[in-house]
Amino acid sequence: MKIKSKIVLVTGGANGIGKALCERFAAEGAEKIYVADIDFENAEKVAESVNGKAFRLDVSDEANCRLVVEEILSEAGRIDFIASNAGIGGAEGSLEVSNEVWQKIYEINVLSHVYLARAAFPSMIANGAGAFMITSSAAGLLTHPTAAPYVVTKHGAVALAESFSIEFHGQGIYVSCLCPQGVKTDLILGAENPNSFLMPEAISAEECADAVVSALEKEVFLILPHAEVGDYIVKKAENRDRWLHSLRKMRAAVLNSKNI
């Protein structure tokens, strides 16, 4: 799938990977880019830079998701591609985190994709074509030494993308799942950030967007901007006990470095 001449919606488009996606899609010749984010001020700036349109969107609110999709369909007549990219990092402890925080992270990292698909898939199916990309994380494939709510919900996002691909491929919808490792965004920047250990192998948001465009053109399901993640998947599958042992050691090192 080529982005040229496509009507595109990017959630979480105000910053980081989402912003880079909008800019790259514009460079690829997208017909119109809709930039949706709860950070409306920055969404407007991105939209202006790509000659697009901004929406204030709380992806955890299904009615808000439906309204945005309906407005785009009313204005543009179709949506060719949705980058369901909005997400949130998670608090560290699996048991210390409140039920309310667990629920909020789940709504943003998993249910938001359901809300957008529920609103947009009927029109895509009617048009006989469409594409939908869920942004998960390498943590959704490999796990992570900290931040259990993030890990659990990103695993859920991968499983949801797989389910969508199985269910809707035959109706003309190409589904993909973006699973980057370290990307130089606010999720890992800063020495006190518990994800700062990812910095040595981190790529720029622009490099991540480049990988997305390349993968979309090949219509692959799993988009891995970090090639080594594919090797890690194999290692985890070959010996899960050894993999968990390595993550326990990594967790201890991370917590020790933070004096936790």
Task: Say what each PLM segment does.
Residues 14-15:
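Conserved glycine-rich cofactor-binding loop
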Residues 28, 142, 163-173:
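Active-site-adjacent segment of SDR/Rossmann-fold oxidoreductases
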Residues 40-41, 57-67, 99:
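The beta1-alpha1 cofactor-binding region of Rossmann-like NAD(H)/NADP(H)-dependent oxidoreductases
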Residues 93-94, 98-103:
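Substrate-binding pocket helix/loop in short-chain dehydrogenase/reductase
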Residues 117, 153:
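Active-site helix of classical SDR
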